[in-house]
Each structure stands twice: as C-alpha cells, then as structure tokens.
From Swiss-Prot:
UniProt source species: Prochlorococcus marinus (strain NATL2A)
Keyword Cytoplasm: yes
Phylogenetic lineage: Bacteria, Bacillati, Cyanobacteriota, Cyanophyceae, Synechococcales
Positions of disulphide bridges: none
Record bears the keyword Nuclease: no
PANTHER family xref list: FERROCHELATASE (PTHR11108), FERROCHELATASE, MITOCHONDRIAL (PTHR11108:SF1)
UniProt protein name: Ferrochelatase
Amino acid sequence: MARVGVLLLNLGGPERIKDVGPFLYNLFSDPEIIRLPVRAFQKPLAWLISLLRSSKSQEAYRSIGGGSPLRRITEQQARELQSYLRNIGIDATTYVAMRYWHPFTESAVADMKADGVSEVVVLPLYPHFSISTSGSSFRELKRLKDGDDEFAELSIRCIRSWFDHPAYVSSMAELIKKQILACDLPQESHVFFTAHGVPKSYVEEAGDPYQDQIQNCSLLIIDQLENSLGFTNSFSLAYQSRVGPEEWLKPYTEEVLEKLGKSGVKELVVVPISFVSEHIETLQEIDIEYKEIAQKNGIVNFKRVPALDVYPLFIEGLADLVSSCLNGEGISLEEASKLPERVKLYPQEKWQWGWNNSSEVWNGRVAMIVFLSFLMELIIGGGPLHQIGLL
C-alpha cells in the first residue's frame, strides 16, 4: 500500500527580528516576485531591497510580537489536517514546505524520502493561483525533482487552486457573518474584501489568472453570505501590500478605505480574502495601518474577519481536496509548474554569480554600481530610490 505524504506549500516568514533581512533577500531573489530581463541583476537587487526595507519591516514585526506566527499556524494546520485524514481512513502524513524561510522545501522533501513516502499530494495554502505564489512553489518543487532521482520516482499530484471549493467558500461566509451580526447596524455594514496584490503586468502581460479567481471567489462568498443572512450588504474589493514603483492591481486598499469613509460608511467588515493564516499582512498591515486610515476617514466600527487558521470546516475542506486528489483528480507537477507562454523567466535554480571569468567581472561591476548608487543617495538625500519610496 502506498505511503501518502501531503505537502503543504506556504510563503514562510521570519520568526525573529534578526531573520527579517535574510527572509527579504530570499523573497526578492525569486524571479516570480520581481521579474527582470537580466538574470545577473536579481541577486544584487534582492540584496539592495532587503537592505533598504529591513529596518521598516523589523518595526512591523516588533509591533506584532517580534516575529511571524505563520510557521506555527501552518504546522498546526498540518497536524489538524493529518488527524482529520486519518480519522476518515486516509493514512497520510503531512509536511510543511515554506518558500522563503524555514522549513524550506528541500527539508520537507528530505523528510518525505526518509519516511518512505511513495505518493505525494501537493496542496498550496493559497486558495487562488498566481505565478508569484503557488506557481513559484511548484517551480521550486519541480527544480528539486529534476535534480533528485529518488524524489523523481515518487508519484506526485498537485492541486493548483481551490478558491471555489464549497467548504472554503462556506468557511469564509460563516466567519464574515459573525462579524456582520456583531455590528450595531448589521444591514448597513459594508463588506470589504482585501487581497494581496500582484503587479498589473502579471495579469495583463503574463496571463496570471489570479485577479479573475479573486473576483469570482468574492462573488461566491457574497452569494452564500446573502443566502445565510437573508439581507444584502454592500461590498467592495481592493488589493494591498504593493511594493516598488510598478503599477499593481487596483484599486489599492488604502485608497478604497479613504473613499468608503468619505462616502459615509460607518461600519466596516474587513475580509482578508487571500490569506488563510494570520501573519504580518493581517496582524500589522490590516489591524494597525489600515484601521488607522479607516478611522481617520470617519469609519467608526472597524471589524476584521479572522484568518481561517484551523477553522474546522476549513480543515474538512482541505481533507476533501486531498481525498479527491488521491482518487484521480489533481494534475502532475509538470503541468502545475508550467507557466503561460508569455511569461519570460530564467530557470529557477540555485546559482552563484558568474559562470566564467568574464561574467564574474561584469557581475562585480553591476554590484559595485548598485552599491555606489545607494551610497550616493544616502549622502545627497535624493534620487530615484527616494522617489519610488525605498529610501
């Protein structure tokens, strides 16, 4: 009988203040996070961004206790899912693979091989597919498979997205309903979906399905919510967490909050739709930054729907996804990691600067130019990095 491993994919997060810089470097080293036409620029740019953003990010993590709870919650989700699966007769072991911090994907793969797993179900903890989230994790897993004959022998099936799964939609609707009914005037409360943004070019140029899935998911949740409540709430959708000068999906969360407040909305129920675990973007960005913006613009009652974490119906839904995959649904890792033809990315592989003496020289020159430009801006107090908000 096949020994089943369920591999949960997630982003990862720094657990201590001193981890913030290395975490940011790992994040921005990923070509799916920042798409550059020249491979040699990726590492210097990641180093520069992590250097510039570390101080501000460290303050954000201090405001929520000094580190991200994402690993703890994800591992708790893994335990709950494993217990549920075994209770329904599926003898599976769950493993956690973080993309940018511990436990890394390599560690999870090593654990599965050591445990004698022969069949793997890959389940991203991102309901909505994007080339920068699930796509990046699938590609990293494919890279490991291509370089490991033992891992390549395993049967691997993947779940690409699950934004429309009934248990997920119902879980979200139930949690939103609780917050609406806790408002002073439930029927007048405004439901505000906020999703993690991606650059607009990902959708319009690269064919990323993320925006369509977010919009469709919001409508599914609203429809179920209305059926449950018996009345209709106004609602809107926006995108948060943009980085850098590039245009991201609009409207932006902070701008919509200002408009809602000025339009007379007093009771707001904020729904972090693309997050299934509490982490920096719910606990700090929404609960602190966006709450302050809302209150400054006249919103009196600001309620935030909690992340799903280990909500029982949500765990049941994850188990159903695993069960369906074991029964023939799901797709191959090759298909899951495949990008639209319009996406131009260099291979996602571990690499050292330089492949020969000439390239070493050019890599050094690029790094020196970046470093000197950074120092010059610090000295004169102005320049492109100041203009785009990195300094």
